[in-house]
């Protein structure tokens, strides 16, 4: 029998990847019901082990740009268990507490990670925000959110539907007459005081109309460079970021 042995489980409400050595096992588990698809894990991962869902862009039908709705948003996850280093950074930075590292079958809380104990990462300065559905979110990033209405011409509603805090709303009730035809226009509202700057809307937008900026990661305490410094740069998002 050869080691390490790898396995994947993507059935049910959780996804898991596992690597089994002769004496020890390491596992990353994703709770799909908690995950919003914000892709903080994708950006932060030092091994680029996570794969993200790519929203399908608009298509032209009878001269109009439309988006075919998907019934379910896809969540990011690790497709090759050997790509992951099982360091646990993804569990440390996940705003929605959707990821867990298991060592020999036992869950390791983020504050007990070896990364924390060895001071490879500092302490996150976050505030707990309780959502209407009862979930709590760790908000430790700051930035801004705007929308380019000229690029948002499809009415897909992805951003409003995926936003966990209700910061984005759309009102498709404005009807105007153009070129002799009546057309429905979207009125988009962003209540930035509700924004968690998690990145879910940024990831779900198929046209790049949403311009999310994450320019500050809040933390304090000692840490060892360069691991955390590089993670911070990966966590940030600029309006021109086309990697999503």
Feature annotation, model-predicted:
Residues 1-23, 57-244:
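Flanking helices and flexible, charged tails adjoining ferredoxin-like Fe-S electron-transfer domains
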Residues 31-32, 149:
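Local sequence-structure signature of Cys/Sec-based thiol-disulfide redox active-site neighborhoods
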Residues 14-27, 33-59:
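The feature marks the first
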